[in-house]
């Protein structure tokens, strides 16, 4: 999270090839700088399903791939093996209290019901995260600058953030409460 969000996303917001938040699975396209494929014309129909899988992807693959990639980039300062063990440990703890404890101590639900509940919770969480985070950066007013030959962009970091971030639903009391203010990005 520190590397992916705080360093890469907030330093390189909406810069293709650097901001992982605008480079999802190949079937989705968030940046006009990404290659346009025929399937993308239906993205408005199927994106919701992939948003719903977001937290399952984090749990199963994204964190592991990210750790490897960030180690290769030199961001992992405490040692790859140590961070990998910590990552596996915390995923086991999470799965233990979210899946194993209910299976052991809750008699009212079957194994299948607990798994369906777990997957439903993750699907809804991913959908909510997608619905809150995408409007903050992937709007018609957002810019998607490409670095020049010197690997720089023309604006300062602060101006770049203002040009690539959007508030939404500012006057919607329920959305403000529900999103915890995440709809106020600027």
Provide a role label for each language-model segment.
Residues 90, 136-137, 185:
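Generic beta-strand/beta-sheet core signal
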Residues 3, 66-67, 112-116, 127-148:
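Juxtamembrane/interface segments at transmembrane-helix termini
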């Amino acid at each position: 999270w520190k590397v992916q969000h705080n360093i890469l996303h907030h330093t390189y917001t909406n810069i293709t090839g650097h901001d992982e938040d605008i480079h999802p699975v190949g079937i989705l396209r968030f940046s006009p700088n990404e290659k346009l494929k025929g399937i993308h014309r239906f993205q408005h129909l199927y994106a919701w399903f992939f948003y719903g899988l977001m937290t399952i992807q984090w749990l199963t693959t994204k964190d592991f791939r990210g750790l490897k990639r960030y180690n290769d980039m030199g961001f992992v300062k405490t040692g790859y093996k140590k961070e990998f063990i910590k990552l596996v440990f915390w995923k086991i703890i999470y799965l233990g209290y979210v899946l194993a404890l209910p299976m052991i101590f809750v008699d009212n639900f079957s194994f299948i019901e607990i798994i369906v509940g777990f997957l439903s919770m993750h699907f809804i969480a991913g959908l909510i995260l997608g619905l809150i985070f995408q409007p903050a950066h992937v709007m018609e007013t957002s810019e998607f600058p490409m670095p020049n030959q010197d690997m720089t962009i023309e604006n300062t970091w602060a101006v770049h953030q203002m040009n690539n971030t959007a508030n939404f639903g500012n006057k919607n009391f329920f959305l403000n409460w529900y999103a915890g203010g995440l709809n106020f990005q600027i």
